């Protein structure tokens, strides 16, 4: 009988202590943040009061108006108005300007070359009537059948395009039509653009350029065809009734 009473009292005491600890954790701490009325330093007479009495014409510790420790108008520690540590008016710390300019982050500068290049590329593609500009490629290593042509190509390959113009693959019935159109528009556009800059191409240049661009157009067709079929497979997959039913069920579980 005595043991049961002792056990009950121990249980009650444990519950009371647990409740008190929980309340203490939820209870907000007295006082406030910085400068909310409480004293940060010992020896102050009244709560919320200043350690030193205010003097005429200023805030706490200001003999002549201004920030703390200012004999004249200005920022903290400014004898004549200016940035911190500045003997005379002017800029932020170490330079001209106001006190508020100390830590202003500098605005990122826009690279005007990139903007101009992007705008020019967009104008060219838009002016070609629906053609798109492919990504840059490495110029292929091609053998033309003679040592002279092979050497000429290695020495002048940088003058030939490394990007091709093309239309979506679904507008063509086969690869040959895509490549033929891609080669014609790319060689024509590159020739006109380069000739405008004062550089001319010989017949050998045109011959080599067509071979190089043909290889790049074939590569571009393979990339676009693969991406096109992948998009089509994704559409078919997500439009099938079982997948639609599964997605609807998952949405119902999440919302419900």
UniProtKB/Swiss-Prot annotation:
<feature type="repeat" description="5">
    <location>
        <begin position="87"/>
        <end position="95"/>
    </location>
</feature>
<feature type="binding site">
    <location>
        <position position="81"/>
    </location>
    <ligand>
        <name>Cu(2+) 3</name>
    </ligand>
</feature>
<keyword id="KW-0862">Zinc</keyword>
<comment type="similarity">
    <text>Belongs to the prion family.</text>
</comment>
<dbReference type="InterPro" id="IPR025860">
    <property type="entry name" value="Prion_N"/>
</dbReference>
<keyword id="KW-0472">Membrane</keyword>
<dbReference type="GO" id="GO:0005794">
    <property type="term" value="C:Golgi apparatus"/>
</dbReference>
<feature type="lipid moiety-binding region" description="GPI-anchor amidated alanine">
    <location>
        <position position="233"/>
    </location>
</feature>
<dbReference type="Pfam" id="PF11587">
    <property type="entry name" value="Prion_bPrPp"/>
</dbReference>
<feature type="binding site">
    <location>
        <position position="80"/>
    </location>
    <ligand>
        <name>Cu(2+) 3</name>
    </ligand>
</feature>
<dbReference type="Pfam" id="PF00377">
    <property type="entry name" value="Prion"/>
</dbReference>
<feature type="region of interest" description="Disordered">
    <location>
        <begin position="28"/>
        <end position="110"/>
    </location>
</feature>
<feature type="repeat" description="3">
    <location>
        <begin position="71"/>
        <end position="78"/>
    </location>
</feature>
<feature type="binding site">
    <location>
        <position position="82"/>
    </location>
    <ligand>
        <name>Cu(2+) 3</name>
    </ligand>
</feature>
<feature type="repeat" description="1">
    <location>
        <begin position="54"/>
        <end position="62"/>
    </location>
</feature>
<feature type="propeptide" description="Removed in mature form">
    <location>
        <begin position="234"/>
        <end position="256"/>
    </location>
</feature>
<feature type="binding site">
    <location>
        <position position="65"/>
    </location>
    <ligand>
        <name>Cu(2+) 1</name>
    </ligand>
</feature>
<keyword id="KW-0479">Metal-binding</keyword>
<feature type="disulfide bond">
    <location>
        <begin position="182"/>
        <end position="217"/>
    </location>
</feature>
<keyword id="KW-0336">GPI-anchor</keyword>
<dbReference type="Pfam" id="PF03991">
    <property type="entry name" value="Prion_octapep"/>
</dbReference>
<feature type="glycosylation site" description="N-linked (GlcNAc...) asparagine">
    <location>
        <position position="200"/>
    </location>
</feature>
<feature type="binding site">
    <location>
        <position position="90"/>
    </location>
    <ligand>
        <name>Cu(2+) 4</name>
    </ligand>
</feature>
<keyword id="KW-0640">Prion</keyword>
<dbReference type="GO" id="GO:0005507">
    <property type="term" value="F:copper ion binding"/>
</dbReference>
<feature type="binding site">
    <location>
        <position position="88"/>
    </location>
    <ligand>
        <name>Cu(2+) 4</name>
    </ligand>
</feature>
<feature type="compositionally biased region" description="Gly residues">
    <location>
        <begin position="58"/>
        <end position="99"/>
    </location>
</feature>
<feature type="binding site">
    <location>
        <position position="64"/>
    </location>
    <ligand>
        <name>Cu(2+) 1</name>
    </ligand>
</feature>
<dbReference type="InterPro" id="IPR022416">
    <property type="entry name" value="Prion/Doppel_prot_b-ribbon_dom"/>
</dbReference>
<keyword id="KW-0186">Copper</keyword>
<keyword id="KW-1003">Cell membrane</keyword>
<feature type="binding site">
    <location>
        <position position="74"/>
    </location>
    <ligand>
        <name>Cu(2+) 2</name>
    </ligand>
</feature>
<keyword id="KW-0333">Golgi apparatus</keyword>
<dbReference type="InterPro" id="IPR000817">
    <property type="entry name" value="Prion"/>
</dbReference>
<comment type="function">
    <text>Its primary physiological function is unclear. Has cytoprotective activity against internal or environmental stresses. May play a role in neuronal development and synaptic plasticity. May be required for neuronal myelin sheath maintenance. May play a role in iron uptake and iron homeostasis. Soluble oligomers are toxic to cultured neuroblastoma cells and induce apoptosis (in vitro). Association with GPC1 (via its heparan sulfate chains) targets PRNP to lipid rafts. Also provides Cu(2+) or Zn(2+) for the ascorbate-mediated GPC1 deaminase degradation of its heparan sulfate side chains.</text>
</comment>
<keyword id="KW-0732">Signal</keyword>
<dbReference type="InterPro" id="IPR020949">
    <property type="entry name" value="Prion_copper_b_octapeptide"/>
</dbReference>
<feature type="binding site">
    <location>
        <position position="72"/>
    </location>
    <ligand>
        <name>Cu(2+) 2</name>
    </ligand>
</feature>
<keyword id="KW-1015">Disulfide bond</keyword>
<comment type="subunit">
    <text>Monomer and homodimer. Has a tendency to aggregate into amyloid fibrils containing a cross-beta spine, formed by a steric zipper of superposed beta-strands. Soluble oligomers may represent an intermediate stage on the path to fibril formation. Copper binding may promote oligomerization. Interacts with GRB2, APP, ERI3/PRNPIP and SYN1. Mislocalized cytosolically exposed PrP interacts with MGRN1; this interaction alters MGRN1 subcellular location and causes lysosomal enlargement. Interacts with KIAA1191.</text>
</comment>
<feature type="region of interest" description="5 X 8 AA tandem repeats of P-H-G-G-G-W-G-Q">
    <location>
        <begin position="54"/>
        <end position="95"/>
    </location>
</feature>
<feature type="repeat" description="4">
    <location>
        <begin position="79"/>
        <end position="86"/>
    </location>
</feature>
């Amino acid at each position: 009988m005595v043991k049961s009473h002792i056990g009950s009292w121990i249980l009650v005491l444990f519950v009371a202590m647990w409740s008190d600890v929980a309340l203490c954790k939820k209870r907000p701490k007295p006082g406030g943040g910085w400068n909310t009325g409480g004293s940060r330093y010992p020896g102050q007479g009244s709560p919320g009061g200043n350690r030193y009495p205010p003097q005429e014409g200023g805030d706490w510790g200001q003999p002549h108006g201004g920030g703390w420790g200012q004999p004249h108008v200005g920022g903290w520690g400014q004898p004549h108005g200016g940035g911190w540590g500045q003997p005379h008016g002017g800029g932020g710390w170490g330079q001209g300007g106001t006190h508020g300019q100390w830590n202003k982050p500098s605005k990122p500068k826009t690279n005007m070359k990139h903007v101009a290049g992007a705008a020019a590329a967009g104008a060219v593609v838009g002016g070609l009537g629906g053609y798109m500009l492919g990504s840059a490629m490495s110029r292929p290593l091609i053998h033309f059948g003679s040592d002279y042509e092979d050497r000429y190509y290695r020495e002048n390959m940088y003058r030939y395009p490394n990007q091709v113009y093309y239309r979506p693959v679904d507008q063509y019935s086969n690869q040959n039509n895509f490549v033929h159109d891609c080669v014609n528009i790319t060689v024509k556009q590159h020739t006109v653009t380069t000739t405008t800059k004062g550089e001319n191409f010989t017949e050998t240049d045109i011959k080599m350029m067509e071979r190089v661009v043909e290889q790049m157009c074939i590569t571009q067709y393979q990339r676009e065809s693969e991406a096109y079929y992948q998009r089509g497979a994704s559409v078919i997959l997500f439009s099938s009734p079982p997948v639609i039913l599964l997605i609807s069920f998952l949405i119902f579980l999440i919302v419900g």
